[in-house]
Swiss-Prot record:
Full protein name: Nucleoside diphosphate kinase
Similarity field: Belongs to the NDK family.
Chain positions recorded as ATP binding sites: 11, 59, 87, 93, 104, 114
Location of the active site: 117
Subunit structure: Homotetramer.
InterPro entries in alphabetical order: NDK-like_dom, NDK-like_dom_sf, Nucleoside_diP_kinase
Chief location bin: cytoplasm
Naturally occurring in which organism (per UniProt): Hyphomonas neptunium (strain ATCC 15444)
Length: 140
């Protein structure tokens, strides 16, 4: 399998509790390299664009409000089979269902405040990365 990139967001529920370093440690221990990272305050327009796939869902407004409620850390991760690897490291969306040792089991507050986002496909990873990073922002 070739080296692949995926996109990650450390969400406001985690940044407000100063968990970025602890989450990064789990990411790196799993063999994922952080090749791009920045802490930002997402705007409403950015959050609405990022989560536009959910715009017709009843939770869309709450999701956008949550994502702009505090700083987030956007990241590009790299490894062989990075998308699958990171999704395994994140754990199930609902932390109650997440496996022991996963980011969501360790740090998430609830299904809504579940600490991290990760791309679900190579196509979405490319689109999500491009929303926040240029190739010049990333290291090898």
């Amino acid at each position: 399998m070739a080296v692949q990139r995926t996109f990650s967001i450390i969400k406001p529920d985690a940044t407000e509790r100063n968990l970025t370093g602890a989450i990064n440690a789990v990411i790196e221990k799993a063999g994922l390299r952080i090749v791009g990272q920045r802490r930002i305050q997402m705007t409403r327009a950015q959050a609405e664009r990022f989560y536009s796939v959910h715009s017709a869902r009843p939770f869309f407004g709450e999701l956008v409000d949550f994502m702009i409620s505090g700083p987030v850390v956007v990241q590009v991760l790299e490894a062989e089979d990075a998308i699958t690897k990171y999704r395994e490291v994140m754990g199930a969306t609902n932390p109650a269902d997440a496996a022991d040792g996963t980011i969501r089991k360790l740090f998430a507050k609830s299904i809504g405040e579940n600490s991290v986002h990760g791309s679900d496909s190579a196509e979405n990873a490319a689109l999500e990365i491009a929303q926040f990073f240029s190739e010049a922002d990333l290291t090898n």
